[in-house]
């Protein structure tokens, strides 16, 4: 969707990073943070806070909130999310509401999506055409 630059990071990759896993998604998040190219939306923050485990993870989230760019889930994003949900279902694709909102947000702001969730491989091409 985006052409280089900023990335909207999905909760799937944030969780890998926050839990200190040495996975590829965790390393990609680390690199995006170092380059100042990490972003998230309110929906992702809710998901992360809802699943935060222990004080170390909560402290890391608090610190990240002051340095990671927040992309608002505004009226345009919600409109794209509804359209993306409808078009995805028409193609027989089922994705979580959270993934739909993140993909719509990325489409709205022309951002890349960092993820480790197979739903995105199916819905991002649809979102790119919104």
What residue ranges belong to the model's regions?
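A generic structural signal for short hydrophobic patches within well-formed alpha-helices
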Residues: 14-15, 45-48, 120-121
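A general structural signal for well-ordered alpha-helical segments in protein cores
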Residues: 26, 45, 58-61, 78-81, ...
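Short active-site oxyanion
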Residues: 35-37, 67-69, 107-112
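Acidic catalytic patch
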Residues: 47, 68-90
């Amino acid at each position: 969707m985006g052409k280089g630059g900023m990335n909207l990071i999905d909760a799937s990759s944030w969780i890998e990073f926050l839990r200190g896993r040495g996975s590829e998604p965790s390393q990609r998040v680390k690199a995006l943070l170092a380059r100042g190219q990490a972003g998230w939306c309110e929906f992702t923050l809710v998901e992360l806070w809802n699943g935060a485990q222990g004080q170390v993870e909560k402290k890391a989230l608090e610190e990240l909130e002051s340095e990671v760019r927040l992309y608002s889930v505004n009226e345009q994003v919600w409109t794209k999310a509804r359209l993306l949900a409808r078009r995805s279902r028409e193609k027989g694709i089922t994705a979580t509401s959270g993934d739909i909102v993140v993909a719509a947000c990325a489409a709205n702001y022309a951002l890349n999506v960092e993820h480790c969730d197979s739903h995105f491989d199916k819905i991002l091409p649809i979102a790119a055409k919104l």
